[in-house]
From Swiss-Prot:
This is Phosphoadenosine 5'-phosphosulfate reductase. Gene3D superfamilies: HUPs. It holds the Pfam family PAPS_reduct. One of its GO terms (cellular component) is cytoplasm. One of its GO terms (molecular function) is phosphoadenylyl-sulfate reductase (thioredoxin) activity. Its EC number is 1.8.4.8. It is found in: Cytoplasm. Its main location: cytoplasm. It comes from the Bacteria. Pathway: Sulfur metabolism; hydrogen sulfide biosynthesis; sulfite from sulfate: step 3/3. Catalyzes the formation of sulfite from phosphoadenosine 5'-phosphosulfate (PAPS) using thioredoxin as an electron donor. Belongs to the PAPS reductase family. CysH subfamily. The active site is at C239.
Length: 253
């Protein structure tokens, strides 16, 4: 790939950013996931992070990125409502992959939030958005700021939902580079990688879960359901982490 003056890209106008990102992404689409990660580490600054929900297929991204950058900070935004199996999975992968794990939480405890606001996840789309702002978006923003992150990795894939179908490999979100090396991978690609490196799926996959989140907004898949309908009562797919100006909404990982 040609060299790009990416240090200056964040200072350019929105139109200039769009044009240059389109050129870069055309090149990145031709690379393998491993090559994309290496390119990002060589071109997107010096301070990186990997955001992980430790969901169904999270072992792939964690293994892929830490193979190239073993000490990269792994950011988990812990709502306090994850499944017990998710917390056990976090412990398992942290030990096995020697993860440099950083756990960020809302500044107000879950019990205090319920006392103040009630069960926000039962209050329609607006309640879910507020819940996500408090428990996902603000902690992630704080993590990126405190770790001085120049670019962060995420395991989003186009195949996962309609809201992700047109996402590029490289984007700028809220003034920080966001990099999606698995964006064009299929479920079969994921399975092959897990098998190749003897990596586990999340344990609840075997019980019918396709996507993992909080206990109160995650459902098992049933015949006729899309993957999107297993999260947030089908009202939303995203949790907030993957939207521009996400603090004003609250939508995904």
């Amino acid at each position: 790939m040609p060299n790009y003056a990416l240090a200056d890209l964040l200072e350019k106008t929105k139109i200039e950013q769009i044009l240059q990102l389109a050129e870069i992404n055309a090149e990145l689409e031709a690379l393998s996931a491993q090559e994309r990660v290496r390119w990002a580490l060589a071109n997107l600054g010096s301070e990186f992070a990997l955001a992980s929900s430790f969901g169904i297929q999270s072992a792939v991204m964690l293994h892929l990125v830490t193979n190239e950058s073993p000490k990269v900070p792994v950011i988990l935004t812990d709502t306090g409502y994850l499944f017990p199996e998710t917390y056990q999975f976090i412990d398992q992968l942290t030990l096995r992959l020697s993860l440099n794990l950083y756990v960020y939480r809302a500044e107000i405890s879950s019990a205090w939030q319920e006392a103040r606001h009630g069960k926000l996840w039962e209050q329609g789309v607006d309640g879910i958005k507020q819940y996500n702002r408090l428990n996902k978006v603000e902690p992630m923003r704080r993590a990126l700021d405190e770790l001085n992150v120049s670019a962060w990795f995420s395991g989003l894939r186009r195949e996962q939902s309609s809201s992700r179908a047109s996402l590029p490999v490289l984007a700028i979100q809220n003034g920080v580079f966001k990099f999606l090396p698995l964006i064009d991978w299929t479920d079969n690609d994921i399975e092959q990688y897990l098998n190749q490196y003897d990596l586990p799926y999340h344990p609840l996959r075997d019980e019918g879960y396709l996507s993992m989140g909080d206990t109160h907004t995650t459902k098992k898949w049933e015949p006729g359901m899309t993957e999107e309908e297993t999260r947030f009562f089908g009202l939303k797919r995203e949790c907030g982490l993957h939207e521009e100006d996400a603090e004003s909404d609250g939508s995904g990982i």
